[in-house]
């Protein structure tokens, strides 16, 4: 049986999670929380680097952060869709790991994959709690599960605040 985790974090691409909430991950792990990461794509369309290089970087980052696991769903970079098939993939993971908290990309990000990934994860988080949606893994029917909270991260590089601005 898969152990329940406290926080499940989704990113459209490898590196989205670290850039968007790496500090939060470290803090939560230091506070004893269990954390799993899920990249939706391999980032194969990225301008800088390659899917292979990003895989190496995410493996290293995951080890440094001390997360419990990291998965890649292999969705097509640039073409993430909030459709039924994609929702079922996410629902199965939510039901498998039963997180209390889910964190994902910001819904209004200008990058189409980030915005669509956010909508996908939010939709699946709701649907995972519906008893009439049936899912199974390895021929075992999954129980419904809805996380208590869904939060969004915004990479700090997207903000233009300085200390005097916020004080």
Give each language-model segment a name.
Residues 33, 145-148:
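A short helix->loop->beta-strand "cap" motif at the edges of active sites that frequently abuts
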């Amino acid at each position: 049986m898969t152990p329940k985790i406290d926080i499940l974090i989704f990113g459209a691409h490898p590196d989205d999670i670290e850039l968007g909430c790496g500090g939060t991950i470290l803090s939560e792990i230091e506070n004893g929380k269990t954390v799993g990461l899920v990249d939706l794509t391999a980032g194969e369309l990225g301008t800088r680097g390659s899917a292979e290089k990003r895989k190496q970087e995410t493996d290293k980052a995951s080890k440094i952060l001390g997360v419990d696991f990291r998965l890649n769903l292999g969705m097509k970079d640039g073409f993430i869709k909030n459709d039924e098939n994609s929702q079922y993939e996410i629902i199965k993971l939510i039901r498998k790991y039963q997180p209390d908290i889910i964190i994902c990309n910001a819904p209004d990000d200008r990058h189409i994959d980030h915005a669509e990934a956010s909508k996908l994860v939010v939709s699946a988080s709701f649907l995972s709690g519906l008893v009439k949606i049936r899912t199974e893994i390895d021929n075992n029917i999954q129980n419904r599960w809805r996380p208590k909270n869904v939060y969004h991260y915004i990479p700090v590089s997207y903000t233009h605040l300085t200390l005097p601005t916020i004080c």
